[in-house]
Each structure stands twice: as structure tokens, then as C-alpha cells.
Amino acid sequence: GTPFGVKMFSEGALIVGFSDIDSPGGSTVNPAKAAGLRLGDRVIRIGQIRTENNDAVKEALEAARGSAAEVIYVRSGEQRSTTLTPVWDAAAAQWRAGMWVRDSSAGVGTLTFVDPEKGVFAGLGHPISDGDTGESIALRSGEIVPCEITGCSMGTVGSPGELKGKFLSAHAIGSIRINGENGVYGTTRTGFSGQTMPVAFAQEVETGNAQILATVAGETPRTYHVRIEKISDADPRRNMVVRVVDKALLTRTGGIVQGMSGSPILQNGRLVGAVTHVLV
């Protein structure tokens, strides 16, 4: 139930947009589109240069100097290749490909559990995805940092609402090892306060009263009352429908809002799941 800040760097440069270029010949061109690249493609090499970040992409385009360069990229989990020829952008005085790329992401999430003996943690309840493309970010490295919740946009019909937070320190309190379908997982050497609790078996979870641990102000988690209305094994990422019945939480946030993902769900003294999505 403790909030944390996330800083994550991707494996390769993710294409998040395109921008046409005025070529020296007077025509408008887009080398990236001409090469068959699409939004959401992850560029991992241009020529002989591995594009681990945005600066490496710029370096690779400069190295090509208008010559055709092989581009290795990943689309839908499959590695592919194409050929791209950068053009000279006189206005920017540099070689360009006509694509916008992103190499990192940052945000706020909620811690689900920490195993104090093994020093591992889980949080967020869903993968970290790029805000423009919706693609899950391929993890190169990542860390979590202390965070404080400073405000909230209330959830309403058709609008999910959102917790707002700020990073309290640049000092990492944990390293992210996995950006998976059910959340982020990693290691930490920092002690977290909390209550030790067994994990329920699937058959022990039942519809009815339950609680969530969440932080909607400051840094301290609180327990709020919810009801588990439906249990399903059909979707491995969404096993329960949970309704907030706690008046204090409804007054402050309107229900589950973005940023509460990862909040642990408790029932009968056991950890039974985590908040993953907001219904709007």
C-alpha cells in the first residue's frame, strides 16, 4: 500500500511519432515511414550502433551521413530488419529519420508486497506501458524511489481519475528486474514497515467483504473497505471485480483511480490479490 516512484529505461528506442522533413531537393520526405517503420516499433540498432537511448539514435544517423543503414527493430515481440536512409534537415542542421523516439518512462505506483527474507518486491499490478503507443516497455534497467501523494483527481463516470505524486529523493530504494503482465518485480535492501501476512490460495478467495491497503495522501497507507463482487479465472490478469464501499475513500477519490494500481487486496487475514485496472 506504500506509494513509490518509478524510473525505467527501455531496451532500445521506442517510436512514438513521426515528423516529415523538408529535403534539400525541396520535397517533403519521411525516411522512417519509407523504411516501413511504425508506431510502437522498438529500434535496437542502426548500422553498427546499438540504440540504447535517444542520443545513440542521433549518433547512428550522423554516422550514416545520408547513406542507407540497416535498422534492426522489434515489432510485436519479433525482431525484424529494414533499411533506412537519413536525410539532411537544413533547418535543424542535422541528419534525421523523421521519427520521434523515447527511451525512458517515469510515474507513480503502489507497492503490493515485500518479502523481507528474500528482499524482493512486487507492485503496480500491470506492466509499465508507453503513454503514446500503449506498448509495454521492454526493460533495460529501472528503479523505484520514495514518493509522496500530493493530490488526487476524482474518478467519475467515463473518467478514471488519478493520484498525483512527487519523488522525494533521487536515491533508489529498489531495482526493477521484471516489467511483467501482472506488475513490476524487483529487489530492495530497504526495510519497509508493514504487517506480515500469508498469501491465500485461489480457492480460498470468495465474494464478499474485503479490504485494500492504499495511500491517497502523503506516504502512509490506510485500510479501506471494499467488496469482491465477482471472481473469474477466464483472464489471468483480471481475476476479480472489486467495488469500493468505504465512504471515506469514495469521498476523497470517487473510488479506484489511476495510481492505486498495485494496492493489495486483503480478505480474512490473507493477501488475495492486487488492484490492477480502473473501470470507467
Mark where each language-model region is.
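PDZ/PDZ-like groove recognition
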Residues: 2-38
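Generic structural signal for buried aliphatic residues
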Residues: 43-44, 57, 69, 90, ...
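Serine endopeptidase catalytic core focused on the charge-relay Asp
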Residues: 87-258, 267-268, 276
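Short beta->alpha transition motifs characteristic of CBS
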Residues: 273-280
